[in-house]
Amino acid sequence: MLRNNPLPHADVLRRRDPLLRHRSVDEPELMDDPACDPVALDNTYRLFGVINPLVASWRPVYRRYVRPALRAAAREGRPGTVLDIGCGGGDVARAITRWAARDGLDVRITGIDPDARATRWAAAHDRGVGAAYRTLASHDLVAAGERYDAVISNHMLHHLTREELSAVLADSRRLTRGVAVHNDLRRSRAAWLLYWVATLPLARARVFVRFDGLLSIRRSYRPGELRQALPPGWRAVQQRFFRLLAVHTGQDAEAVQADRDQVDTPQKDRTQSDPGRTS
């Protein structure tokens, strides 16, 4: 997989705003290009299964938010259902299915992505999990009247414009009967520098992981920014390891709250003391 390639060096991300005061919303990620290198894209989807468990911290999110919703469904005598919006290569859907099985919970997971390249790859690498992958957008499921016990996404929010963010969050509220939790990066200089060092061995690899990952950090929110962008009913929850969640628990989810584990309790929003905060 390592070879010379025409991908731009990650150092170009330091040309502007080196202190990460502002979101880099105008810089596109390479893998979002419909004409991007298909080999690099395939390699990137494959590496997501290695990198996301290390950087996305989904296990505590599953324990605190998703598992209680699945247990509530089990008490009603039915399988729990999870919708993964923007599922990419399906690594999060596969992980949640495995964790639920270990917890003795029956779960049906649907992964959706408007990019057919993602859903094709996810379906081809499902590894017997049995998740359903569909090439469509969240508003299509709203129109179909579908509902799920938990609606999730991974590293999606920073890709969206303000209008798209509002639309996806509105769809998430309509689609969940329990909890909606969107797990994303939290922008900071420390996160950027750590990722720059950690992915240095991939600097000349035929993958998008390094360039797009560094850009994703620059595009992501700080807690105060996300709070201002969220509509009523949503809250920004700061997590360890440079993570930031957008969480909604509706009326149907109130009973779920009591079943939450005391695992990785979200920190208070410490925007003022964020080590990456400069303004």
Regions found by a protein language model. Name each.
Residues 185-229:
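C-terminal alpha-helical "lid/dimerization" subdomain adjacent to the S-adenosyl-L-methionine
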Residues 83, 89-91, 96-140:
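Class I SAM-dependent methyltransferase SAM/SAH-binding core
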Residues 219, 223-250, 279:
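Conserved Class I S-adenosyl-L-methionine
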Residues 176-185:
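Conserved beta-strand signature within the Rossmann-like core of class I S-adenosyl-L-methionine
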Residues 160-171:
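A short, conserved alpha-helix within the catalytic core of class I
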Residues 152:
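A conserved beta-strand element that flanks and buttresses the S-adenosyl-L-methionine
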